[in-house]
UniProtKB/Swiss-Prot annotation:
The keyword Transit peptide does not apply. This is Transcription and mRNA export factor ENY2. Pfam families: EnY2. Belongs to the ENY2 family. The gene is eny2. One of its GO terms (biological process) is transcription elongation by RNA polymerase II. GO terms for cellular component: DUBm complex; nuclear pore; nucleoplasm; SAGA complex; transcription export complex 2. It is found in: Nucleus, Nucleoplasm. Involved in mRNA export coupled transcription activation by association with both the TREX-2 and the SAGA complexes. The transcription regulatory histone acetylation (HAT) complex SAGA is a multiprotein complex that activates transcription by remodeling chromatin and mediating histone acetylation and deubiquitination. Within the SAGA complex, participates in a subcomplex that specifically deubiquitinates histones. The SAGA complex is recruited to specific gene promoters by activators, where it is required for transcription.
Length: 123
């Protein structure tokens, strides 16, 4: 049995992400995933680590006139790196399960998941 490789062009990738996002919203799964993600991040200490990083930045820059946007720009990449790999893996697994066989054909493609969780650093 010959295997075929599907090449997803950038515009198709954007369309696929948009379709997935829409399905997650319409079904209510996005909201459930946000709640799950928040609880796992709190349990794992991620939220506390991000708060500490924010406090350190503010303490070290209290004499400078910085904007909240500056803090967010600095902390966001740090916060993303601190997300435990198991939490990411569990989230992706749950999304794949939700999407079912339709996405299994594309399992070798990396789908970047953007999330605006309620516990992001600017809250």
């Amino acid at each position: 049995m010959a295997s075929t490789t599907t090449t997803i062009l950038p515009k198709d990738h954007i369309k696929l992400r948009s379709t997935i996002h829409q399905k997650l919203i319409e079904s209510g799964e996005k909201e459930r995933l946000k709640v799950l993600l928040k609880s796992k991040l709190v349990e794992g200490g991620w939220r506390d680590e991000v708060k500490i990083a924010c406090r350190e930045y503010i303490k070290n820059n209290q004499n400078e006139n910085f904007k909240i946007e500056d803090l967010i720009a600095l902390i966001t990449p740090i916060a993303k790196k601190k997300v435990p790999p198991q939490v990411k893996a569990d989230l992706i697994k749950r999304i794949r399960k939700f999407l079912g066989p339709n996405i299994q054909n594309h399992h070798h493609h990396h789908i970047h998941i953007q999330s605006n969780t309620p516990n992001s650093p600017h809250h």
